[in-house]
Amino acid sequence: MAIRKFKPYTPGTRQRVVTDFSEITSAKPERSLIVPKHRVKGRNNRGVITCRHRGGGHKRQYRLVDFRRDKRNINAKVAAIHYDPHRNARLALLFYEDGEKRYIIAPAGVKVGQNVISGESVPIEDGNAMPLSVMPLGSSVHCVELYAGRGAQMVRSAGASAQVMAKEGDYVALKLPSTEVRLVRKECYATLGEVGNSEIRNTSLGKAGRRRWLGRRPQVRGSVMNPCDHPHGGGEGKAPIGRAGPVTPWGKPALGLKTRKKNKPSNKLVVRRRRRISKRSRGGRDS
């Protein structure tokens, strides 16, 4: 997979950088694995906005992805690589020997016609799913379960991978993409390799309209609003915030406040916290 740059024929193509979609082998999804999806547009069950800047965008159908990989010791053939509008990663369509079809997150390097399998005693190859207890130290994994049988909950985005660092007792230490080292039960399943489409980080939408197609609405700084709309608003010209620190539109502390509970039970499973990102490298903006 590669990225594609455009000549500045128009202002929209001047900054546009997209993936070339060369790994996509079929334009139409598997009919039996798609369902309608009602888009909530950032609202909760009462219709109140809980996530701002969401709405619009192209109509989508949800692809049913197999995050459990619970068909044990049954060979599956990669029939196609499909596009998924709900994620940056690609989907691999699997045809199992018993006739069932399933989608999985497409690992990097997996080709059409390749065989993958899930089980405890399967070959150490990219795309195969197995318990963390049987994976070699230093191997890269993705689609990691937090609880056995619940399905993959971590390391699912495009280009992501975790590294098996150590094994001790009933737990396996994983180094996550955030640099956090966390203990996971050894019977939890994961898939070997990293998630494909890693070049997505080098792309650029190029224009505001393309962002609207994805369902993202404009984001306005609080400092340019009126005081009735945001705590940062009001004043003459470029006025300061007027508070000890930045806050959300609802008056809660923002930009740097730790939100994880100090007595959370899973704290004992975190061996090393993630590396702090400095304000300069983060490039945060006014909320």
Swiss-Prot record:
Biological processes, Gene Ontology terms: translation
Sequence segments annotated as region (Disordered): 221-287
Keyword Ribonucleoprotein: yes
Keyword Protease annotated: no
Biased composition (Basic residues): 258-287
One Pfam family hit: Ribosomal_L2
One Gene Ontology cellular component annotation held by this UniProt entry: large ribosomal subunit
Keywords: Ribonucleoprotein, Ribosomal protein, RNA-binding, rRNA-binding
InterPro entries referenced in this protein's UniProt entry, alphabetically: NA-bd_OB-fold (IPR012340), Rib_uL2_dom2 (IPR014722), Ribosomal_uL2 (IPR002171), Ribosomal_uL2_bac/org-type (IPR005880), Ribosomal_uL2_C (IPR022669), Ribosomal_uL2_CS (IPR022671), Ribosomal_uL2_dom3 (IPR014726), Ribosomal_uL2_RNA-bd_dom (IPR022666)
GO molecular function: rRNA binding; structural constituent of ribosome; transferase activity
PROSITE patterns: RIBOSOMAL_L2 (PS00467)
Function: One of the primary rRNA binding proteins. Required for association of the 30S and 50S subunits to form the 70S ribosome, for tRNA binding and peptide bond formation. It has been suggested to have peptidyltransferase activity; this is somewhat controversial. Makes several contacts with the 16S rRNA in the 70S ribosome.
Description of how the protein assembles with itself and partners: Part of the 50S ribosomal subunit. Forms a bridge to the 30S subunit in the 70S ribosome.
PANTHER family: LARGE RIBOSOMAL SUBUNIT PROTEIN UL2M (PTHR13691:SF5), RIBOSOMAL PROTEIN L2 (PTHR13691)
Family: Belongs to the universal ribosomal protein uL2 family.
Name the record gives this protein: Large ribosomal subunit protein uL2
